[in-house]
Amino acid sequence: MATKEPESVYELSIEDAKGNNLALSQYKDKVLLIVNVASKCGMTNSNYTELNELYNRYKDKGLEILAFPCNQFGDEEPGTNDQITDFVCTRFKSEFPIFNKIEVNGENASPLYKFLKKGKWGIFGDDIQWNFAKFLVDKNGQAVQRYYPTTSPLTLEHDIKNLLNIS
């Protein structure tokens, strides 16, 4: 019997950095920025700094940033979940949630990333190309935009404000 494909991210569950199962439905009616992150990437400092800025600016207006460590690109996220969380929270003082380390491509890709990538993105196919690829998800749980890893988080502000209905 075939498994029913999810129709929104809210139908999926994920694991937090402590291994607890969390339903994404807890983020219903929020705008989500979902990012695959790495601690040892050349883009780490700029991305975390700008993600923090966006989060601090819009968290009270309905934005949630979900960060998913991934070690599939150049072994740039080799640490344990505890090491990763400690690094992000200590070095960058990030307050947005950091989740369990996942894979974003291949057979073992997280169901969340399989849903996000499904069929409508990327000139090189659906695969994530590197660390810090970003997906913007609307309040209905639909991925409405995908941004390349090199896209500065602050350049997403206009799109985020539109989804939050902020002029």
Curated annotation (Swiss-Prot):
Top enzyme class: oxidoreductase
Region forming the signal peptide: none
GO biological process: response to oxidative stress
InterPro entries: Glutathione_peroxidase, GPX_AS, GPX_CS, Thioredoxin-like_sf
Annotated Gene3D superfamilies: Glutaredoxin
Pfam families: GSHPx (PF00255)
Reaction(s) the record says it catalyses: 2 glutathione + H2O2 = glutathione disulfide + 2 H2O
Protein name: Probable glutathione peroxidase 8
Species the sequence originates in: Arabidopsis thaliana
Residues annotated as catalytic: 41
Name of the gene encoding the protein in the UniProt record: GPX8
Function comment: May constitute a glutathione peroxidase-like protective system against oxidative stresses.
Native organism taxonomy: Eukaryota, Viridiplantae, Streptophyta, Embryophyta, Tracheophyta
